[in-house]
Amino acid sequence: MIPLIHQTPRLTLLAASRALLTAELHKPRYFPVLLGAVLPTDWPPGEYDEDAMRFFLDQLTAGGRTAAGWYGWYAIRKATPTSPKTLVGAGGFMGPPDASGTAEIGYSIAADWRGQGLATELVTGLIEQAERTGMVRRLIAHTLPDNPASQQVLLANGFQTMGLDPEGRVRFERIVEPQAL
């Protein structure tokens, strides 16, 4: 079974569940209570929109327990003496790895929390999570050509630029060294 919580120095990464996604989509005032964290004012961030939430919920519903951990992950900044636990971003995988061991990741950080290295830390955590599954051999990611901050996050995490994909996005790849649980 895939671990559904992953810790980094400043973040707790929590795998999305059907209950969390349902609350996020349909009962937003209960979502932070279930999550146990304060929401930023601009939630949801970036490309993590209602369509992404619905996609993750549909995939978790269709895939049952085997789908857990292969879709959305919430990035919660750990409490400090001056601030409570706060949801700062979302990321995750677009599904389990394919037959060759390739999985795709994506991520978004709330505007109020950008520029603090949290996206880099979130991606590091997703890479570590992929390694922990023992199933992923290669990760891919895409950014828009006019998003240098996102490109820097990937480069800082050992991804290499592979050129443009057919949709005009910059494609990145990274080899993963799987580690059995």
Where does each model-flagged region fall?
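GNAT-family acyltransferases
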Residues: M1-E104, I109-D112, G125-T133, L144-D146, ...
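Conserved dinucleotide-binding and phosphotransfer motif residues
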Residues: N157
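Conserved active-site tyrosine of GNAT-family acetyltransferases
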Residues: L154
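Glycine-rich acyl-CoA binding loop
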Residues: G117-T120
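Conserved beta-strand-loop-alpha-helix junction that forms the acyl-donor binding cleft
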Residues: A141-Q151
